[in-house]
Amino acid sequence: MAADGTIRHDWAIDEIVALHNLPLLELVGRANAVHRMHHDPNKVQKASLLSIKTGGCPENCAYCPQSAHHREVDLTRDRLMDPESVVAMAATARAAGAERFCMGAAWRQVRDGREFDAVIEMVKGVRALGMEACVTLGMLKPHQAERLAAAGLTAYNHNLDTSPEFYGQIITTRTYQDRLDTLATVRSFGIDLCCGGIIGMGETIRDRASMLHILAAMEPHPESVPINALVPVEGTPLAKRPVIAPLELVRMVATARLVMPASTVRLSAGRSNLNREAQILCLVAGANSVFYGDTLLTTPNAGIGEDAELFAAIGELDCDHVSASAA
């Protein structure tokens, strides 16, 4: 069960379960030590996330209010935004302190044509601002990944969501292998991977470890690993799931840090349910990025004012944490 900061790709699920279940202070202590080996503990990257096309997705993800299958969800569908508006919002996010701008479209897969051309222009515009650019567009083909890479895309987000074993209880319109194939396509064109999952959907601890096992077996590890806690939304199949206890998120962050020491661990959806102290504990446990802004796609997030108070409480953190690829 050694977790000494060495980059490994041979973790066993049982090893990861054992790490996750360590006494909390031991787990967080180990994770913080490993974090300091690979990262400046005073650097926390702020990322902003915008829904550039909202609702009407043909996938049936049980957690997602944007699925067309969940007709009782109160959600206004919006067509793809125009590039000028998106780049203007990126500039606003940059002025508020964000270094990374993430754009999400509720699609099953990328289609060639006017809309994809518009996304390419968005990526170019965000990069011209000196920001990292990330998109999540669903599945994509090699020639599309090539175009995104040529436009300067920093990272492509495509989450595994959960373990292979639990996956079929959450989504049936896309296979786990579909997700892995998309990740392989992205990486083959030199685009960074942003890939993580969601906890609190009814999965077991072993499911959580199994998902981390899949990620940690990738060579190299995903450059970015978002850890999300389910935000139950009325009208979705998971609407009645209880909100997870904050320390479950702390444990997941710490375990992710131990098995993927050099990756950026992003504290993502569900952060609005954490008090200031729980968020700080997540940062101590190895999270080194937060999503900044009032909403994450269509779910609530901690407000910018709250985050300003959070960082003030911590002290003078260096939040100017932009990768060299964004220069």
Curated annotation (Swiss-Prot):
Q: Which domain of life is it from?
A: Bacteria
Q: Keywords assigned by UniProt?
A: 2Fe-2S, 4Fe-4S, Biotin biosynthesis, Iron, Iron-sulfur, Metal-binding, S-adenosyl-L-methionine, Transferase
Q: Tell me the residue numbers annotated for binding [2Fe-2S] cluster.
A: 102, 134, 194, 266
Q: What is its EC number?
A: 2.8.1.6
Q: Which residues bind [4Fe-4S] cluster?
A: 57, 61, 64
Catalytically driven reaction(s): (4R,5S)-dethiobiotin + (sulfur carrier)-SH + 2 reduced [2Fe-2S]-[ferredoxin] + 2 S-adenosyl-L-methionine = (sulfur carrier)-H + biotin + 2 5'-deoxyadenosine + 2 L-methionine + 2 oxidized [2Fe-2S]-[ferredoxin]
Q: Which cofactor does it need?
A: [4Fe-4S] cluster; [2Fe-2S] cluster
Q: In which pathway does it act?
A: Cofactor biosynthesis; biotin biosynthesis; biotin from 7,8-diaminononanoate: step 2/2
Which residue ranges does the record assign to the Radical SAM core domain?
42-268
Give the note describing cofactor binding and stoichiometry: Binds 1 [4Fe-4S] cluster. The cluster is coordinated with 3 cysteines and an exchangeable S-adenosyl-L-methionine. Binds 1 [2Fe-2S] cluster. The cluster is coordinated with 3 cysteines and 1 arginine.
- Tell me the Gene Ontology biological-process terms attached to this UniProt entry: biotin biosynthetic process
MF term (GO), any? 4 iron, 4 sulfur cluster binding
The answer to whether UniProt assigns keyword Nucleotide-binding to this entry is no
PANTHER family recorded: BIOTIN SYNTHASE (PTHR22976), BIOTIN SYNTHASE, MITOCHONDRIAL (PTHR22976:SF2)
Oligomeric and partner information: Homodimer.
HAMAP family for this protein: BioB
Q: What is this protein called?
A: Biotin synthase
Q: What is the organism of origin for this protein? A: Rhizobium rhizogenes (strain K84 / ATCC BAA-868)
Q: What is the lineage of its organism?
A: Bacteria, Pseudomonadati, Pseudomonadota, Alphaproteobacteria, Hyphomicrobiales
Q: Which gene encodes it?
A: bioB
